[in-house]
UniProtKB/Swiss-Prot annotation:
<dbReference type="GO" id="GO:0030436">
    <property type="term" value="P:asexual sporulation"/>
</dbReference>
<comment type="similarity">
    <text>Belongs to the Tlp family.</text>
</comment>
<dbReference type="Pfam" id="PF19824">
    <property type="entry name" value="Tlp"/>
</dbReference>
<dbReference type="InterPro" id="IPR017524">
    <property type="entry name" value="SASP_thioredoxin-like"/>
</dbReference>
<feature type="compositionally biased region" description="Basic and acidic residues">
    <location>
        <begin position="34"/>
        <end position="73"/>
    </location>
</feature>
<protein>
    <recommendedName>
        <fullName>Small, acid-soluble spore protein Tlp</fullName>
    </recommendedName>
</protein>
<feature type="region of interest" description="Disordered">
    <location>
        <begin position="34"/>
        <end position="80"/>
    </location>
</feature>
<keyword id="KW-0749">Sporulation</keyword>
<dbReference type="GO" id="GO:0030435">
    <property type="term" value="P:sporulation resulting in formation of a cellular spore"/>
</dbReference>
Length: 80
């Protein structure tokens, strides 16, 4: 019988800050595009877009908090 256990990848956090910054930028772009699309949206669609953009803003705040955590961890050598 073959052993199907896969060894987990090592924890590589070296580029987490950059990935999170990209995620913030992409989310901001999505918000801007959504705002532009509201020009052609029905009232119901506008409401959904506004709600989604509110959730996107919450995500951005979470990303920024995580960026701070990751930056601090990077400065401290990723020690637990």
């Amino acid at each position: 019988m073959t052993n199907n256990y896969q060894k987990p990848n090592p924890d590589d956090r070296s580029d987490n800050v950059e990935k999170l910054q990209d995620m913030v930028q992409n989310t901001i772009e999505n918000i801007e595009e959504a705002k532009e699309s509201m020009e052609f949206a029905t009232d119901e669609e506008k409401q959904r877009i506004q709600e989604k953009n509110a959730r996107r803003n919450e995500s951005i705040e979470s990303f920024r908090s995580e960026i701070q955590d990751e930056s601090a961890a990077r400065e401290n050598g990723y020690q637990s």
